[in-house]
Structures are given as C-alpha cells and as structure tokens.
Amino acid sequence: MKLKSRFTSIIGVITLFFSQTVTAESDVVISVDEGVSMAQPIAVVPFKANGGVPADVGQIIADDLRNSGKFTPVERSKLPAQPGSAAEVNSQQWTDIGVDSVVVGQVTPTGGGYNVAYQLVDTLSNPATVLAQGAFNVPAAQIRQGAHTVSDQVFEKITQIRGAFRTKIAYVVQRGVSSYELRVSDYDGYNAFTVVKSKEPLMSPEWSPDGSRLAYVTFENKKAQVVVHDLRSGSRRVVAALRGHNGAPAFSPDGSRIAFASNQDGELDIYVVGANGGKPSKLTANAGNNTEPSWSPDGSTIYFTSDRAGSPQVYRMGLSGGGASPMGGSGSYNAKVSSDGKNLIMIAGDKVVKRDLASGGTEVLSSTFLDESPSISPNGIMVIYSSTKGTSKVLQLVSADGRFKANLPGAGGQFKFPAWSPYLTK
C-alpha cells in the first residue's frame, strides 16, 4: 500500500459543549456480534418506573456493562426476582445462579425531567450489602445520560476503572458521491447530530482534549485543509493549508498544538502547528512518506506511519525530531496510544491489533474485514473502528481485551473515520 495514495483517498458539561439541537435520532445502534463467556456475571434488574418513562434505563445500563467486555449481564428471562431496592434483594436467590452483584433502581418523573435512583448490591453477604448508591435528576431529553451515569458509577465501583459511557463519538457519513456529514453521537450511537455538511469529502475527525473542538480534514476549498471546529459556537478556523494535501490531524494532550501530515515538499511529512494556526514546524525529514501522527499521553513522543523501509509501518520518535524507531512491524498503520501509555492500538494485516509497549506482545482484537481508523475510549477499555461489510463501510466496537465484539450498523451511507471523545464530565 502506498501511503500517499492512502492519504489522498482517504448531561451538564456535555450539553454545554454542543450548540446543535440534540434529539433521540441515531445513525447507528450497537448490535452484538460476539458476547463474553468469561466476563463477570452481573444482574441489572428492570428499574421500577413510577409513571411513564421514555427509555428502559435498566436495559441501557446492562448494555453499557456488556459493551465494556468486563461483564455478562443476566438475561431478563433468567432473573430469579425483580426487586426494586436493596431491602428486597434475597442474597440466596442470586448466589444460587452465580451472581454476586445486582443493580436495582427506580425512575420517577419530576418537573420537566426524571429522578434516577440506583443501588449496587453485593449478594455475597446476607443480608445483602449496598456497595454504591446514588440519586440524581436529569432533564427529560437526557434520560439516557442518566442511565449512562449509573453505568459509569457501577463500572468504577467494581473495576476501579473510570467508566466512559457518557462519552461521544464523531464519525463521517458519506451518502452518494457528493454528500458528506460529520456527525457526533453518544458512544452507543444514540442522540446523533450533524456538525457540518459538505459536498466535498470530510475526513479524519479528532477531538480536542477538553472535548470542545474537533479537528478534521475538509476539501471544501478544492484542496485538503485541516480545520478546527468549535462545537459550542459553531465557528471554524483553518489551521493547516500548506501547498498540496494536509491531513491526519491529532491534538496534543494539552490541546495547544496539532500534529498533521502534508506533502508540500513532494512526499508526506509530519508537521506541528498551534491549535489556533500559525507557522507549522516540520518534524520528519526522511525519505518516504510519513503520516497519521498520534501523541503519547505525556506529549513527548509522536507515533506515526511511514513507508521509509518500503512498506507501511508504525514508528516512534521524540517531539524534537531526530531518529525514529519501528514499533508495529511491516504492514502496520493507523496507530493510537492508550491513555495510560501502555498499549498501542493499530491496524496490521487489515485487523485491529493491540501491542503491549513494555513487552512487545501483540494481540489481534478484531475478526472483521478491511479494518481502519481505530480509536480508543478514554479509559482504554473499548475500541471503535470502521470495517468493510459487503459494499459498505460500517462502524465496529471491540473490547480492548478482544472478548466482546459488536457492530453499529448504519442505514443509507458509508460510515467512516470514527473518533472517540475524551471524558466530557468531571
């Protein structure tokens, strides 16, 4: 594969970031391909609804926990009981079916919204012990965010890992030959809205570290330029418009700079520019094409794809430039670093692959076809990417341990370039 041809072809705080009207519209909704047989069993009892509720809060929580790959929720038809509070939980009923943790709760309409209350119950003690509980009000339009909040708290209490169910994804939808949309939705595909529409290609969205901006590639001026789009105001700024093509933007961890690729000197090289624009500085200067930069969490290192050795391969180099070390093996590209800096997620052999940066061990995560553009959840637990299904590009989800796989089927378009947001809540 030639890199140059690849480059040219190719609740609360949350609502403050987005000026567009958010509805329950969804382009894509998670559909399970492969569940997890060895994950921790958990029971999420249907939440008691005190009045009409527009969403099944308990099911949303169960789906979130399942999607992480860490839990296997008990099917509702196999629940031995449906308690509404910890006081109603009979520990023996649950331990008899191998369940140590039970989530119960209620949803009650309030003025203009709902009160969501939950308890996480440990059934290993008798009577059952409450491990975590909470109650909070959410606007009616944010009922799914209320469910995701419960999921985050339950997930963190059990795993000691911060939950990422209130995050979002950005992606590009292509319909026909001259209709492109940059869309943003909840991580599970719900509450989608359009950021920008164009008759020219849109590519490679990337989030700023605070989740308030998206950098992406647009051809609206008949050339590939990198723009930064403020999601609160809707304003846009061109930050990279060198001669030739500009693409593959990546925000630095502090949000002050953007690394990108440009072929202004003939071959592709990595440049760094201020997040508000300015004069770019050139980072690579080797023979061959260099593209797809990705920052290490501490901002000291850039991972990128280069064909300097004859075929695409992931390399690593210090931000000051200089020598680069091969990291991914021949045929690897599209690398992203996990937020803890321990793993590299990339494409190799057209599959999503995880590489342990300490040991060098690799693991194939996906089992789909012609995979591209992996993006990691901020807690490192899940990976979203695009793949080819028939004649369509679709979004796929896989847990970072490879045990849970799902697709997000979309209708009426090609779904490409997914990008997972950072945490959007404190």
From Swiss-Prot:
Top-level taxon in the UniProt lineage: Bacteria
Protein name, UniProt field: Tol-Pal system protein TolB
UniProt main location, coarse: periplasm
Summary of subunit composition and partner proteins: The Tol-Pal system is composed of five core proteins: the inner membrane proteins TolA, TolQ and TolR, the periplasmic protein TolB and the outer membrane protein Pal. They form a network linking the inner and outer membranes and the peptidoglycan layer.
Matching NCBIfam families: propeller_TolB
Gene3D superfamilies (UniProt xref): TolB, C-terminal domain, TolB, N-terminal domain
Pfam family, one: PD40
Subcellular location: Periplasm
Biological process terms in GO annotation: cell division; protein import
Family: Belongs to the TolB family.
Keywords: Cell cycle, Cell division, Periplasm, Signal
Primary role: Part of the Tol-Pal system, which plays a role in outer membrane invagination during cell division and is important for maintaining outer membrane integrity.
Gene: tolB
Signal peptide start-end: 1-24
Any one GO CC term of the record: periplasmic space
Organism: Actinobacillus pleuropneumoniae serotype 3 (strain JL03)
InterPro entries recorded: 6-blade_b-propeller_TolB-like, PD40, Tol-Pal_TolB, TolB_N
